[in-house]
Amino acid sequence: MEKERIELRLDYVLNSGKKTGKSYESILKLIAETFGVQLTTTIHNRNISYYLIAITSPAKLAILINYLNEYSLFTSKYLNFQDFSNCVNMMLNKEHLTISGREKITILKESMNNKRTYGII
């Protein structure tokens, strides 16, 4: 039987600010250093440069979740965070190793970001 791999990562992507003339690079470097990861730059649509912080370590994800539980996000970002937090907790509890756990994670993932069909009222 082929083993399915589930990867859980949280990427924060922010426009590098070339249009506004304001850069978030210094604060984003501090955030990246806090989590022991690199601040990288990526190019997206129309050659727009974005900063990227990617956190994959379960221990570091748990720290981030604790922080965001105390200092909440707003709008659909909050809903995406709730789903993401549920996925992290499932993985920390090894639920992702079961068929039902993988199915639940897939359902949560499929409802995130632009696929979300509901919002905060």
Swiss-Prot record:
Any Pfam family matching the protein: LAGLIDADG_1
Main location: mitochondrion
SUPFAM superfamilies: Homing endonucleases
Xref: InterPro entries: Homing_endonucl, LAGLIDADG_dom, LAGLIDADG_Endonuclease
Function: Mitochondrial DNA endonuclease involved in intron homing.
Note: Encoded within intron 1 of COX1.
EC number(s) given by UniProt: 3.1.-.-
Protein name per Swiss-Prot or TrEMBL: Probable intron-encoded DNA endonuclease aI1
Location relative to the cell: Mitochondrion
Entry keyword Endoplasmic reticulum: no
Family: Belongs to the LAGLIDADG endonuclease family.
Signal sequence residues: none
Swiss-Prot/TrEMBL GO biological process terms: intron homing
Gene Ontology molecular-function annotations: endonuclease activity
Superkingdom of origin: Eukaryota
Any one cellular-component term (Gene Ontology): mitochondrion
Annotated keywords: Endonuclease, Hydrolase, Intron homing, Mitochondrion, Nuclease
